[in-house]
């Protein structure tokens, strides 16, 4: 069978920095990005389109004096995604979005042996969670034009106290308030970290924190499609809560040439919410979003390691994380634990840069990540013009792992009387790895089957020019 995949993207960045006097700096950052993907599959006799868009703006002002540092930020962001797809003679339009606008102020100051920082934050959110419309021969289905608005306000205060040349404690309290659907939530979140410094190079730490999350990210696709949506806490969807403990070790050599860090953590999670349906369900039943949200508890644990070299001709870092993210939902099973939708068992990153001289340098990076969990359909068939589906264990399957290597050769030069410039030759995906973007259900000889869609760029060389001013 023939499949045509077309992909287009555009990204725009603008950053303006102004030093407004000896004590003030202003920075304006603007970003807009849009991606379009068309998947034409002969089995479907339909063109499936996926669009997603990000827009962000931030205005930052920093004022510093001998007594304090004040930072203020005004932010705006908007995210949208739209999916148009068809199976046989049935078509689906699915769209989601979230808009945020906010203000934050942070103040840092020192008094005696205490280093203080505190601040306030306010955010307004507007949600459009999963608007959909289905039409065709199986079923007509449509959601009302549902909107959500929410307001979040936070205030926090934190102190870094030196108890002894070898001991210090970082403690604070964050008070958050969230209002949506006529319901208000108020949550005090205490946090404390104890540091022990047996020498100037070694640090041991113990951390405990209580955290609340009012926004919930739901994954709609069972095959890795980027069609997640955001929804708000409400009387029926309580704020997520996490009790977090961590033990850490950090080594820093003389003159900060080398750094080594290790952290082991455990998080106990309450009021966890995930989306248990799939895109296929829109075609097979009279659909209500709330009927496909499951609620439960969970835990995360893992180990993070990092080795970093900061100076010398050879510099870079290696980081590795191994972890597990498990959930239990009474709607699925009162006793069985499942992988979280966002579980990532292994995550490895390597970044290396070698500077031959003041003009030439060679850099490279390698990334590896375990595949995303998803719920695989065991069978899908048509009975009396109706689609019928049967699923396996919730998040019981995984997409293949992804890995990739990139390299870049850079030449830096400064013509007499001009600013520093550089030319860059890079190769993306050096060994032409075919990573799986997502999987989808398609017809194969009158039966449904899973098919992988692979990344378009087997290997991508590029040339870049940079002018510093």
Residue ranges and their predicted role:
Residues 23-100, 226:
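Flexible loop and strand-edge segments within Gram-negative outer membrane beta-barrel domains
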Residues 117, 144-269, 319, 347, ...:
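Structural signature of Gram-negative outer-membrane beta-barrels, strongest in the C-terminal barrel
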Residues 80-82, 128-135, 200-245, 266-290, ...:
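Surface-exposed extracellular loop regions of Gram-negative outer-membrane beta-barrel proteins
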Residues 28-34, 72-78, 118-124, 171-177, ...:
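Transmembrane beta-barrel strands of outer-membrane/channel proteins
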Residues 100-106, 143-156, 238, 255-319, ...:
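Outer membrane beta-barrel strand-and-loop segments of large Gram-negative receptors
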Residues 265-268, 289-378:
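Gram-negative outer-membrane beta-barrel transporters
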Residues 359, 368-385, 402-404, 410-469:
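C-terminal beta-signal and adjacent terminal beta-strands/loops
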């Amino acid at each position: 069978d023939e499949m045509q995949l077309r992909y287009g993207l555009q990204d725009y960045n603008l950053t303006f920095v102004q030093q407004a006097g000896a004590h003030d700096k202003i920075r304006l950052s603007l970003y807009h990005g849009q991606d379009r993907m068309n998947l034409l599959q002969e089995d479907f006799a339909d063109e499936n389109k996926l669009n997603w868009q990000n827009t962000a703006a931030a205005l930052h002002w920093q004022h510093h004096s001998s007594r304090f540092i004040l930072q203020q930020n005004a932010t705006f962001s908007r995210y949208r995604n739209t999916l148009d797809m068809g199976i046989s003679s049935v078509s689906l339009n699915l769209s989601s979005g979230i808009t945020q606008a906010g203000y934050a102020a942070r103040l840092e100051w020192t008094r005696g042996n205490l280093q203080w920082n505190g601040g306030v934050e306010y955010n307004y959110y507007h949600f459009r969670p999963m608007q959909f419309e289905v039409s065709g021969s199986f079923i007509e289905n449509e959601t009302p034009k549902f909107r959500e608005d929410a307001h979040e306000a936070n205030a926090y205060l934190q102190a870094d106290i030196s108890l002894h040349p070898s001991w210090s404690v970082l403690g604070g309290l964050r008070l958050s308030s969230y209002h949506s659907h006529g319901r208000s939530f108020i949550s005090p979140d205490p946090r404390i970290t104890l540091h022990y410094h047996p020498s100037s190079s070694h640090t041991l730490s113990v951390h405990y924190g209580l955290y609340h999350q009012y926004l919930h990210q739901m994954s709609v696709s069972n095959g890795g499609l980027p069609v997640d949506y955001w929804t708000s806490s409400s009387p029926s969807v309580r704020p997520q809560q996490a009790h977090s403990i961590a033990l850490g070790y950090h080594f820093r050599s003389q003159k900060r040439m080398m750094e080594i860090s290790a952290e082991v953590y455990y998080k106990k999670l309450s009021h966890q919410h995930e989306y248990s349906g799939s895109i296929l369900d829109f075609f097979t039943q009279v659909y209500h979003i709330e009927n496909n949200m499951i609620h439960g508890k969970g835990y995360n644990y893992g180990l993070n390691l990092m080795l970093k070299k900061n100076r010398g001709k050879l510099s870079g870092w290696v980081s590795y994380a191994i972890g597990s993210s498990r959930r239990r939902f009474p709607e699925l099973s009162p006793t069985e634990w499942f992988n979280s939708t966002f579980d990532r068992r292994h995550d490895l990153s390597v970044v290396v840069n070698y500077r031959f001289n003041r003009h030439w340098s060679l850099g490279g990076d390698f990334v590896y990540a375990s595949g995303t969990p998803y719920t695989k359909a065991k069978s899908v068939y048509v009975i009396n013009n109706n689609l019928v589906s049967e699923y396996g264990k919730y998040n019981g399957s995984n997409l293949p792992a992804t890995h990739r290597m990139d390299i870049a050769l850079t030449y830096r030069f400064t013509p007499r009387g001009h600013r520093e410039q550089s030319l860059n030759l890079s190769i993306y995906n050096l060994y032409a790895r075919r990573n799986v973007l997502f999987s989808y259900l398609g017809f194969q000889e009158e039966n449904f089957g899973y098919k992988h869609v692979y990344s378009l760029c087997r290997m991508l060389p590029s040339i870049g020019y940079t002018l510093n001013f």
